[in-house]
Amino acid sequence: MITFKRVLLLCTLSAACGGAFAQKVASGVVLDAETKEPLIGAVVCTSNGQKVVSDLNGEFNISVNPGERLSVSYVGYENKQLPIADTQQRTVVKLNRGLTLQEVNVVASIASARNKKAVGADVAHLDAAKLLAKGQAANLSDLLDGRVSGMQMFQSNGKVGMPIRFNMRSGATLSMDRDPIIYIDGVRYNNSHTSDINTSQDALSALNDLPMDDIASIDVIKGPAAAASYGAEAANGVIVITTKRQSGSTLERGKLAATAKISVGWSNKAREYTQFVNNTDINNFFVTGHNVSAYASFTKNFTPGNQLFFSFNESHNGGIVPGNKDVRHSLRAAYDMKQGPFTLNFTVGYVNGDISIPQTAQGRNDAIWNLMRDQKPWGYVSERTWRAMKWKYDNDRLTAALRMAYVLPYDIKLETQLGLDLNHIDGLYTLPYGYLLGTNDEGEKSISNRRNQNLTWDWKASRRFDLGHKLHLTGTLLSQIVQRRETMDKTSASIFPADVDNIAAAAQRSVLETSFEQRTWGLYGEAFLNYDNRLFVNAGLRRDASNLIGRNVASIYYPSLSVAYNMEKAKLRAAYGESGRLPYPTDAFTYYEVKGMSGYGPLLVPGKKGNDNIRPERMREIEAGLDWTPARHQIGLTAYAQFTTDAIIYTPL
């Protein structure tokens, strides 16, 4: 009996030891398949339900039994199954991003870009490179309209090169415009329209200066709550455009990659006008428009972290209105370098455009007005005169951005960026001698010269603090200087001698000169709290000072707060923020007009009375929303309320 018990005990111990030795430890690291960055908080579980979470370096260790499988998951990424045989040694698990609401990084504030799941406000992201790989867009309106909820974009009329109008969630009042501010690669972009020689409805659009094929992604920050970190000009929202920095996928060392694309298209009027009346004049007036575009890009990877990108684009667009043409040539280069704790990014782009804009918004003297009135284009203006008149712009634009970053001891990150946007536009309008317009058949000519300059200089410092096992805090402080300058001089002349169009020979001449400068300085502080990679809280405060506000107003403060909580396939979010709209350049100052001459000099009267106490319009917004991703679809719901104070109202003197 004793022998039997000993044998039974020995068998039991052997079985236990065998089970213990059969169980092994699987170790590895979880990485983003595209960026190779470690994924913190990825869930690794076995078939029997045992779970661990990857650490700050994306690493994990878990006990497994023979025959089990490992499942690795992370919010915003596709799940991956691994046989135990693949995990006997240290394994690198690369997860691909899935089609979920958290799949991309977006601009969370002026100071940071984060995974979308960490953003508590309504920010839309558009992968422009993927869309343009499947088709062609003539302008920003074609690319964005209908793809971003809560925003509509359209051209002011059907001609090529025309201004793009925005109808998006904003806080603008009746006195101010509704256009958002635009950043391209961190540079404040001058998106004002030019109408120096023509009407505002037929102005030259600045947004056409960016080749569509150079755009990598677009983030649309909607409403004052989301855009509060941008301060006194962001009540209409912000559009952040990031351009391409490489051709195709990631390159190996020493490799060269190239892409080329040619697009050809045609456009016609929406429909033939044949109902009820004979509209031959309308149908024959319009022509077939065309679009021809050629694009090429090259990328050279010299060493890891040392890469050069170059692109060229040429486009020829013709509208359906006779004489409407837009020809543009653009060059762009980008250089990226990373050596240890130092990072450098440089981007430079140049665009030259020649555009012809026949007028269709000047009342009785244009063909379209007469078409709408009498179904005939030549009611008050002859076809000979209309086709002889010319409105042309020669446009040159240079944009450049230099960014440098360095990681100090204790993981303190310093970053500075200098951006420049220079725009030179020459305008020319001619009515040749011998062509009757109204009562003038002796010629008319206007020339304009415009210089626009935007300078942006940012400094930023940030550091991450680990407050506990699952709690992390990132503090950021940013200083931003924005300077805008615009100067324009215009000379108009009429009544020329026969076949002479030199302005000096005209009997009547007039000169106009305008200029303005805006200087804005903003200081922004931000605290970002991350708990368990699911709950995110962001609090920020911005202080702005500008030469456009009244002399009795020292500065303006704009607070913001947002919260996001993530579940497996949904995100709850809420945000509150304040932002503003700066007054127009002359709102804070009184200026005078000449109303005649006297023996003592010109007679001056107030043309506009400024307000020493004027401050930016302030928009307060609170929003709450739900983002849900069922069965590889995306559903977003947002409710918001806005409140406006300090509204700017204009009254007669």
Task: Give, region by region, the residue ranges found by the protein language model.
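Extracytoplasmic beta-strand/coil segments of soluble accessory domains associated
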Residues: 142-190, 217, 227-244
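Short acidic/polar hinge/loop motifs at secondary-structure boundaries
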Residues: 61-63, 187-222
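Short, acidic, small-residue-rich periplasmic hinge/interaction motif at the N-terminus
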Residues: 31-34, 42-45, 73-77, 88-132, ...
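Flexible loop and strand-edge segments within Gram-negative outer membrane beta-barrel domains
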Residues: 282, 291-313, 317-324, 328-398, ...
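A beta-strand signature from Gram-negative outer-membrane beta-barrel systems
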Residues: 91-93, 147-149, 212-259, 293
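Outer-membrane beta-barrel signature, preferentially recognizing the C-terminal barrel domain
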Residues: 379-399, 507-524, 587-636, 643
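Surface-exposed loop/turn segments flanking beta-strands in extracellular/periplasmic regions
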Residues: 273-281, 362-384, 428-445, 485-513, ...
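N-terminal periplasmic "start-of-domain" segments of outer-membrane beta-barrel proteins
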Residues: 45, 49-52, 57-59, 107-134, ...
